[in-house]
């Protein structure tokens, strides 16, 4: 079952999933394998924090009941499906009083302003993230918009909605999108591409209100926006890059954003989050600090060299890339990014010595 469908089933009963997915296709088993995180990580942590137990089918055909605090639990949450197949899961849901969110936003002039506003939003709100303009340079490098939301209390609903506070709400229109096919024609490696995209990003930034609060939106419409699902445009072929660095590594984050902006290869905004307490998962991605998500055109000139450079800087700072979205990180950097990698390999060899459950990523990285 997908988390989206689970949320549809439990919301009328006054419950909601503890970590909302950014898209509809994420299954419960997939959320376990990726140790899913969302725009509420600064408060709620990742999916494993709300997972009480699960049943796991291992390669020898045995079904294990896996409880929290065990090595198999820690290897499987974030383990990318390499320890076995999750058959059932016992999950702690979160209570909600309505099916609506109170949303808001704040515009930031540069990356330091954006980080400061995101820190403030994390203290005040359940969900928070920030869109980063990756084409702005100079004094405006890293400018963007902080987005935040909270579950609306019944008293915040107008009378027509208060009569059925938990009713499913129709999806509201998404923010204006570029016409299909336009973004690929404006990618930075084509004539006028960077200038045209830069102008579009600039217009969008200037059109955004300096501050907005108290806008009611349905859960299904608001949460994908907070997780970057409605960011401006999508290229016809992109490489996902997700990295995390700890608190105190803000200079590293500044350099990553500046390098991408200087290359001018981004076609859509990046997504910045603050991560809270990390998960016990041995290969779990989120760790206390900052998370940056990028979608870059696969055909961008020099992209491989750029991402290799970012990998090295992230690893040197004690950070990591997200393996659930990776297709290219070099194996020799993995030990620095995931200190418990050898523990994972040892346990996986014990429960699946013939590598019945494997993947291209596992073979490439020697997991």
Curated annotation (Swiss-Prot):
GO MF annotation list: FAD binding; oxidoreductase activity, acting on the CH-OH group of donors, oxygen as acceptor
Q: Where is the signal peptide?
A: none
InterPro entries associated with the record: FAD-bd_PCMH (IPR016166), FAD-bd_PCMH-like_sf (IPR036318), FAD-bd_PCMH_sub2 (IPR016169), FAD_lactone_oxidase-like (IPR010031), Oxid_FAD_bind_N (IPR006094), Vanillyl_alc_oxidase_C-sub2 (IPR016171)
Could you tell me which residue ranges the FAD-binding PCMH-type domain spans?
Answer: 1-96
Which protein family is named in the record?
To M.tuberculosis Rv3790.
Name of protein: Uncharacterized protein in mprA 5'region
Q: Which organism is it from?
A: Streptomyces coelicolor
């Amino acid at each position: 079952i997908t988390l989206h469908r689970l949320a549809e089933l439990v919301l009328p009963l006054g419950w909601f999933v503890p970590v909302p997915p950014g898209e509809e296709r994420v299954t419960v088993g997939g959320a376990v394998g990726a140790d899913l995180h969302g725009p509420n990580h600064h408060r709620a942590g990742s999916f494993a924090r709300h997972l009480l137990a699960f049943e796991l089918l291992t390669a020898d055909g045995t079904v294990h009941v896996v409880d929290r605090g065990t090595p198999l639990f820690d290897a499987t949450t974030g383990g990318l499906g390499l320890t076995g197949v999750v058959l059932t899961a016992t999950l702690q849901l979160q209570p909600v009083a309505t099916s609506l969110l109170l949303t808001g936003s704040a515009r930031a002039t540069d990356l330091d302003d954006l980080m400061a506003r995101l820190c403030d939003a994390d203290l005040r709100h359940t969900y928070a993230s920030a869109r980063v303009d990756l084409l702005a340079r100079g004094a405006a490098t890293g400018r963007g918009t902080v987005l935040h939301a909270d579950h609306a209390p019944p008293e915040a609903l107008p009378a027509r909605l208060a009569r059925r506070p938990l009713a499913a709400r129709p999806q509201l229109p998404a923010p204006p999108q570029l016409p299909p096919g336009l973004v690929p024609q404006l990618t930075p490696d084509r004539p006028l591409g960077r200038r045209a995209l830069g102008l579009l990003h600039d217009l969008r930034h200037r059109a955004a209100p300096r501050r907005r609060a108290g806008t009611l939106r349905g859960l299904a419409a608001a949460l994908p926006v907070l997780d970057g699902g409605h960011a401006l445009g999508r290229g016809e072929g992109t490489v996902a890059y997700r990295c995390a660095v700890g608190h105190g590594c803000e200079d590293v984050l500044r350099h990553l954003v500046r390098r991408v902006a200087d290359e001018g290869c981004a076609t859509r905004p990046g997504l910045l989050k603050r991560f809270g307490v990390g998960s016990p998962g041995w290969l779990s991605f989120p760790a206390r600090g900052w998370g940056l998500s990028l979608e870059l055109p696969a055909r961008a000139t020099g992209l491989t060299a750029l991402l290799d450079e970012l990998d090295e800087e992230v690893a040197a700072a004690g950070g990591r890339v997200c393996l659930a979205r990776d297709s290219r990180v070099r194996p020799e950097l993995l030990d620095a990014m995931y200190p418990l990698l050898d523990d994972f390999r040892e346990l996986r060899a014990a429960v699946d010595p013939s590598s019945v459950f494997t993947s291209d990523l596992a073979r490439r990285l020697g997991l």
